[in-house]
Regions:
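Bacterial N-terminal signal peptides
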Residues: 1-3
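Non-catalytic architectural context of zinc metalloproteases
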Residues: 30, 42, 60, 65-74, ...
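Intrinsically disordered/low-complexity terminal segments and short unstructured peptides
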Residues: 12-14, 106
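Early extracytoplasmic/domain-onset interaction patches
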Residues: 14-58
């Protein structure tokens, strides 16, 4: 189940990472039966020093340290011309990329088999992503907007449920900065969705819309009953 609140102001327009204005994330699922996701992160306009890529060790609403990087494997890096670089793992959750030309394309796979809101879970029916457990980020790039492109497995009619800002492409979304990105989980599946308004007790004229996306084997009627109970929570 994904509960999606109203988006905050600050939607961004997807642009190219080459000018250094944004960071591009491309997420694909070539073999969901093996429970891993392919991630490509591209950033341009970088200073000459090495770029440090980090995996989070904390997650919103969680009060313990999590070594999310333990699920990362097959790490590679390239410059803007496609030349392969040598990412050095300097700590458990950090890779340093030197020798780039101002642009870095950083790629890796991340394993996930836990749909618990803390990690990520991938199988042939869906992918449920807690972003701190899924996406690495560049140190010093935290204020840059991000564009996230999802590529479902071939032959799957997956949609995307997320509080990331939508674009004209139903599989491309944006975030105004890293903090918003990390706080925006995503569910990819052939889910069902319902929405409802919730009035602000301090301002009854303000009633933002909340959405419920449910990946399940039930009926529309069962989802309707479930959705009617959510506002009571």
């Amino acid at each position: 189940v994904s509960f999606l609140g109203p988006r905050l102001p600050g939607a961004q327009t997807a642009t190219s990472p080459a000018d250094g204005a944004m960071v591009l994330y491309e997420l694909s699922f070539p073999a969901p039966e093996h429970r891993w996701m392919q991630v490509e992160v591209t950033a341009g306009g970088l200073p000459a020093e090495p770029l440090s890529m980090r995996m989070s060790t904390a997650s919103p609403g969680r009060y313990a340290r999590h070594e999310f990087a333990k699920n990362v494997f097959e790490v590679r890096a390239f410059d803007g011309n496609g030349n392969e670089l040598d990412p050095v793992r300097s700590t458990m959750a950090r890779w340093d990329v030197a020798g780039h030309d101002g642009t870095v394309r950083f790629t890796y796979k991340v394993f996930g088999d836990r749909v618990d809101g803390t990690y990520l879970g991938i199988d042939v029916t869906h992918a449920h992503l807690n972003i701190p457990a899924s996406l690495m980020w560049g140190v010093g790039l935290e204020r840059r907007p991000a564009t996230v492109r999802f590529e479902p497995p071939a032959g799957r009619d997956w949609q995307v449920a997320t509080q990331l800002y939508p674009s004209d492409d139903p599989l491309t979304f944006t975030a105004p900065n890293l903090q918003y990105l990390l706080d925006s989980p995503a569910e990819l599946s052939a889910f069902m969705e319902r929405s409802f308004p919730v009035a602000d007790p301090a301002n009854p004229d303000h009633a933002p819309t909340f959405r419920v996306a449910l990946h399940h084997d039930g009926t529309d009627a069962e989802l309707d009953r479930f959705a009617r109970r959510v506002p009571q929570a």
